[in-house]
């Protein structure tokens, strides 16, 4: 379909009157076939593996080998202020910015994470964007895509199967019998199993379970539980690996438990790492989709930012930067967690340097941070959020200033994107603009939800200006900074804490990690709530004077991350009383899914 025809049809879509899934359904009638999209991007026919008409896997290794001497395009990260539980439109802004850069005639790509079934069927939705700034096709994107998260789940759970089988066989059999089966007794301490099972749903009743309650042949009885698949170390590995050989090596380093002599038990010790890698073989290549206006979007990996690394894959960004002049990637939640991990983990491991960071701001979130009433998903918004209130906005700007400071600490040029909502007033917008500009950030008001790329040209122009200015990108901490000092640096300089406290188990693990040589110098992946700069989701605005409580420290040797856990956050979220799955259904006449967003 010609560009003019596509634009004509887009003008018929009204996000005020239509739901996201209705817009997506209409827009999918004039998507580019993925082979056309790939050709426009500069991919050859043998570099794509089509999955239907509109989705393809891309052979990242082949493309990177072919384009190894081509310079990278401009690298842009989209982050946000601390959101309300409803989200502030970061994925929508990512799609809108990609479309806006397209309107300026730029060769542009985007990269976002694959949505987890947990939030898709729970509260937050599928993270495809919204209105006239979406990633399409919506139903496949939201409902498993090409099976990458399923592959991660199966790979992770295979390690647990191997561990459980080994515990059972060692408990039931003599050393002589084990030797006849070519097994050496590992003498695993069942009280020190580091892994749980994985499931890609929000299932709070599975956080803590007892397993193996049958007889001698029914497994090994022990406490266990489930985490959501996107919190798995295997998912983190999919985000950070750089080649198939790198992936294979990492899969053998995952620590699943400890022996009674305090030695770690790895997936390689269980001889399951090769099979785990085999399960991921088709998942290693990024997925190619498109915006509602036909720009290419890579979708790969799906870790949350509050309980995991929160980034799409390194290989997707490397691939896109060779193919486009501008590449827009997204990091999860606010700059305190998603951008901080993009900055100090993803960029450190990839060697890539960003040119600009976009901070998504809404008047709604600033009102919440300024002391507005509680925002509850599924409940009507308090009138404070839909009527003018400049005092709440002005007070809430302190949260925005904290995130601007975080981006500037990285030496990157910040662009504040005011994601415009219908209830916003000129006075509220002026306060946000003036405050951000006084903090030496560029500012753009964007209407991409309502107008698509046409509504994002001001943002796109601000981003290109920022990309063309020199920056002084640098990491928050050097690689050789001791772990305890590194945790305190993140807590003080990014979260605004006064200090850090540790539970006894966290102190014990800290001492063990610090005795493990280079392990303590692996990048630090903090786990904490996304609903506050602090560990406490009730503390809004720009809290100060608090101590960050570290309750546990996990070691992800395969991903190469040390993971301190702050506060009461869970690795398995819960399903709400009014989940999205109640509104999702299938039109039996057309076979199309309705109710997604």
From Swiss-Prot:
ATP binds at residues 84-91. The gene is fhs. GO terms for biological process: tetrahydrofolate interconversion. GO terms for molecular function: ATP binding; formate-tetrahydrofolate ligase activity. Pfam families: FTHFS. InterPro entries: Formate_THF_ligase, Formate_THF_ligase_CS, P-loop_NTPase. Disulfide bonds: none annotated. Belongs to the formate--tetrahydrofolate ligase family. It catalyses: (6S)-5,6,7,8-tetrahydrofolate + formate + ATP = (6R)-10-formyltetrahydrofolate + ADP + phosphate. This is Formate--tetrahydrofolate ligase. Pathway: One-carbon metabolism; tetrahydrofolate interconversion. It comes from the Bacteria. The keyword Cell membrane does not apply. HAMAP family: FTHFS. SUPFAM superfamilies: P-loop containing nucleoside triphosphate hydrolases. It comes from Dehalococcoides mccartyi (strain CBDB1). Its EC number is 6.3.4.3. Keywords: ATP-binding, Ligase, Nucleotide-binding, One-carbon metabolism.
């Amino acid at each position: 379909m010609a560009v003019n025809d596509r634009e004509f049809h887009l003008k018929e879509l009204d996000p005020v009157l239509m739901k996201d899934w209705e817009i997506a359904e209409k827009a999918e009638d004039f998507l580019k076939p993925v082979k056309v999209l790939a050709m426009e991007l500069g991919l050859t026919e043998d570099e794509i593996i089509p999955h239907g008409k509109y989705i393809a896997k891309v052979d990242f290794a082949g493309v990177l080998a072919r384009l190894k001497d081509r310079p990278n395009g401009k690298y842009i990260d989209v982050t946000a202020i601390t959101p309300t539980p409803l989200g502030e439109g970061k994925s929508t802004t990512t799609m809108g910015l990609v479309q806006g850069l397209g309107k300026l005639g730029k060769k542009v790509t985007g990269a976002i994470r694959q949505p987890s079934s947990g939030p898709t069927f729970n509260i937050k939705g599928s993270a495809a964007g919204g209105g006239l700034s979406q990633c399409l096709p919506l139903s496949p994107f939201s409902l498993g895509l090409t099976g990458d998260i399923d592959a991660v789940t199966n790979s992770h759970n295979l390690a647990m199967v191997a561990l459980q089988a080994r515990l059972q066989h060692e408990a039931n059999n003599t050393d002589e019998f084990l030797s006849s089966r070519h097994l050496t007794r590992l003498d695993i301490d069942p009280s020190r199993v580091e892994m749980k099972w994985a499931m890609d749903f929000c299932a709070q009743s599975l956080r803590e379970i007892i397993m193996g309650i049958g007889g001698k042949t029914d497994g090994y009885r022990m406490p266990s539980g489930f985490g959501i698949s996107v919190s798995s170390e295997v998912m983190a590995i999919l985000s950070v690996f750089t080649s198939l050989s790198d992936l294979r090596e990492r899969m053998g380093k995952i620590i699943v438990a400890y022996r009674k002599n305090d030695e770690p038990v790895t997936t390689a010790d269980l001889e399951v790492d090769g099979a785990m890698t085999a399960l991921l073989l088709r998942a290693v290549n990024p997925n190619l989709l498109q915006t509602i206006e036909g720009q290419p979007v890579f979708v790969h990996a799906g870790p949350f930012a509050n309980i995991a690394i929160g980034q799409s894959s390194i290989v997707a960004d490397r691939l896109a930067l060779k193919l486009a002049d501008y590449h827009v990637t997204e990091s999860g939640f606010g700059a305190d967690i998603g951008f901080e991990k993009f900055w100090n983990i993803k960029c450190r491991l990839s060697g890539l340097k960003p040119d600009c960071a976009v901070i998504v701001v809404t008047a709604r979130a600033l009102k919440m941070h300024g002391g507005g009433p509680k925002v509850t998903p599924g409940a009507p918004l308090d009138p404070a959020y839909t009527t003018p209130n400049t005092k709440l906005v002005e007070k809430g700007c302190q949260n925005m200033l904290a995130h601007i400071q975080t981006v500037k600490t990285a030496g990157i040029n910040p662009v504040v994107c005011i994601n415009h909502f219908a209830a916003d007033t000129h006075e509220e917008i002026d306060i946000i603009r003036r405050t951000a500009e006084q903090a030496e950030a560029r500012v753009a008001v964007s209407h991409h939800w309502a107008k698509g790329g046409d509504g994002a040209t001001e943002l796109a122009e601000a981003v290109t200006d920022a990309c063309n200015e020199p920056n002084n990108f640098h990491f928050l901490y050097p690689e050789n900074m001791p772990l305890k000092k590194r945790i305190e640096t993140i807590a003080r300089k990014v979260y605004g804490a006064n200090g850090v406290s540790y539970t006894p188990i966290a102190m014990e693990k800290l001492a063990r990690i610090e005795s493990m040589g280079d392990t303590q110098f692996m990048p630090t992946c903090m786990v904490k709530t996304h609903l506050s700069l602090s560990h406490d989701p009730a503390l809004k605005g720009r809290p100060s004077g608090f101590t960050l409580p570290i309750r546990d420290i996990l070691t992800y040797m395969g991903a190469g991350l040390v993971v301190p856990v702050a506060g009461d956050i869970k690795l398995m979220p819960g399903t709400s009383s009014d989940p999205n799955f109640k509104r999702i259904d299938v039109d039996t006449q057309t076979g199309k899914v309705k109710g997604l967003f």
